[in-house]
Amino acid sequence: STLSAISQTIKNGHQVLVFLNRRGFAPAIICHHCGWSAECHNCDSRLTVHRARNRLICHHCDYQQRVPHLCPGCQGQELISLGEGTERSEEYLEKCFPETKVVRVDRDSTRKKGAMQEVFEIGSSGEPCILIGTQMLAKGHHFATVTLVAVLDADSGLFSPDFRSHERLGQLLTQVAGRSGRGDLPGRVIIQTHQPQHPLLEILIGRGYSIFAQQIMAERKMTQLPPFRHMAVIRAESDRANEAETFLKAARKIAEGLNHPSPLIGYLGPLPAMLEKRAGRYRFVLQIDASKRSILQALLGSLIAELSQLKDSRRVRWSVDVDPQEM
């Protein structure tokens, strides 16, 4: 098991890196009796439990409130923190390994001046310890005696609607795995997943990142996604629920008028953004793709000029994202 591997690594006098890309204590708090859950008033998201600060915090807009003692819905006393964050994992590892130093590395634990330098000193000392952290721990750090990397909850990148999620997951797992065995000592990587037979995970683990990337490219070619089609996303947001969508409907109508229906240009949307409401603003997207970059650029050049003249353009905040890295 993962705990056994951690225990043996510590006994060997080496260091362990535990990776969990989710800060806080737990990603949700719910009532066992009525099902109430703490949600952000400004965003379409749940509030994350930060127990060390006794706060519920939105990781999108930074809205905060105290952790309630009673359920606001039914006044029940059984409020349950669901899921794992770095705080909770740190607490659990401290209980399992009371004689071993456990160091959490995330945006919350490194706020104070000098905190990150202290992490580097601990990691560089070579003394047995457990480093647990988010993505900020995965890149560019050389700790020679880290011989075990444990990745918790690798599944989150497998089921995202963003077509680039598999690519990012492969890059992240490769980066994290690269923290193990960087010195003269051999390294080991444990990946916790509910999908050990997932084809992409099997390729990444069994055949390496190069073959993994080739497989992703083959899938992109089959589904005609970038880089085999050229894409732009027009984003619009407004503090009124329907204005952003209305603006993008007009944008699509104008675009279709500029170019007669053609297999060379495709449209999707307008659709709600993955997080439709963020910081009190409603967000929609219109995706445009073309077989050639020159065709897409010509359309966008004319379309942007037309959109700037729309009256609705003053009531919404809009932008054009060419080759979007996030959907």
PLM regions with names:
Residues 128, 289-308:
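Extended, charge-rich low-complexity interaction segments
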